[in-house]
Swiss-Prot record:
The keyword DNA-binding applies. The keyword Cell membrane does not apply. GO terms for cellular component: cytosol. This is Probable transcriptional regulatory protein Caul_0780. The lineage of its organism: Bacteria, Pseudomonadati, Pseudomonadota, Alphaproteobacteria, Caulobacterales.
Length: 251
């Protein structure tokens, strides 16, 4: 799994380097607006909004931008966004789930489909990939936040289901998994002990990994990059496992 984690981290750094910071801020702002519109515009009374605001703060989204995104949800001319899940199979048999937040369903569907097609993949029907994933709550902390033992102990006390710690320099740090119904309670308990998380969300966790080697690795990465770079795409989940050797070839 080490190669898999490092591969994800390389993608993460590459995405940050290649994508404009404003694009990330736009996605965070959109989630805040939709979350506020789905309930009351008060993070203390709206769990989804609270998560969106906390994640935005973790990414250093300015407070005035957060406030504007919340106010925008209460305006009569605020765009109506649709939340859509697309699923497909990529090079090497990797199953991908794409979560979209869009004000134009036709545009989003056409774009996502084109990415899969151009990169040798195929779009699938709803649940054609999701059955290989679990819907979970996920709380992430950097490795420096705690030792493996301390994070495990705190997670167990908080009622979490599992902890994966990757303490390598290029690793993903601590990822705490919990039932999605318990996410807010677990996140609050961990925050009381370790401070704010780097990310807290409802996520898709793969039940099994699909080994990917050779040329399929680069093709897969191009697809994942294209999906993550799309303005309508909020999150992408995939179940590839890649060796350290193949990761090194990516440069």
């Amino acid at each position: 799994m080490a190669g898999h984690s490092k591969f994800k981290n390389i993608m993460h750094r590459k995405g940050r380097a290649d994508a404009a910071r404003s694009k990330l801020f736009s996605k965070l702002s959109r989630e805040i607006t939709v979350a506020a519109k789905s309930g009351v515009p008060d993070p203390n009374m709206n769990p989804r909004l609270r998560l969106a605001v906390n994640n935005a703060k973790a990414e250093s989204l300015p407070k005035d931008v957060i406030d504007r995104a919340i106010k925008k949800s209460q305006m009569g001319d605020a765009a109506d966004y649709s939340e859509i899940r697309y699923e497909g199979v990529a090079a090497g048999g990797v199953g991908i789930i794409v979560e979209v937040l869009t004000d134009n369903k036709n545009r989003a569907a056409a774009n996502v489909r084109s990415y899969f097609t151009k990169m040798g993949g195929n779009m699938g029907a709803t649940n054609s990939v999701a059955f290989n994933y679990d819907r979970v709550g996920q709380v992430s902390y950097p490795a420096k936040a705690a030792s493996e033992d301390d994070m495990m102990e705190a997670a167990i006390e908080a009622g979490a289901d599992d902890v994966v710690s990757d303490m390598d320099e290029e690793g993903e740090g601590h990822i705490v998994y919990t039932a999605f119904e318990s996410l807010n309670e677990v996140a609050a308990a961990l925050e009381a002990k370790f401070g704010p998380a780097s990310n807290t969300k409802i996520a898709w966790r793969p039940k099994m990994q699909v080994p990917v080697t050779g040329d399929a690795v680069a093709t897969l990465m191009k697809l994942l990059d294209a999906l993550n770079d799309d303005d309508d795409v909020q999150a992408v989940y995939s179940n590839e496992e890649i060796s350290d050797e193949d990761v090194a070839k990516l440069g």
